[in-house]
Amino acid sequence: MGTETLLKIREMGREVKRKRQNEMVDYAYMTAPCGLPCFECYLYLAQFDEEMAETIAGVLGLSKEDTKCKGCRAEDGQCGHLAMECRVYKCIQKTGLQTCAECRDFPCDYLHPYSDQAMKPHNTKVFNLCRIKKVGLEAWAKNEAGGILDKYYYGQWTL
């Protein structure tokens, strides 16, 4: 995906969030068990903007409908854009926990980051879960989640 297209999608997502800023968000429901903020995801936001859905569909080679995700929990862990079943979702369903941050085995291998998936937000899961554990889900969702993704996609690495 080219930088120009990514920036266009980012701006579309910001516009969708601006239009929806007065709507209540159930952050617990809209945070995936693995710590991904579904409420910040471009695939979630695409359901509210047809042009955004078309742009993402073109980039990912998916149907427009498969780009419109309602969130991990609403999709029972099987978002249309994923070809595989989510092991994290299946695991958390068995435990009855809200997120992996609550699990005694956290972090486990299900949360392992992979470089071949670096353009997806999945490499932010462990960091998000650590922040949720430290500041609480609501504070993380309101104050940090969007910034973490922005920094991941658009920030510069520093030591």
PLM region descriptions:
Residues G2-L159:
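Cysteine-centered metal-binding/redox modules
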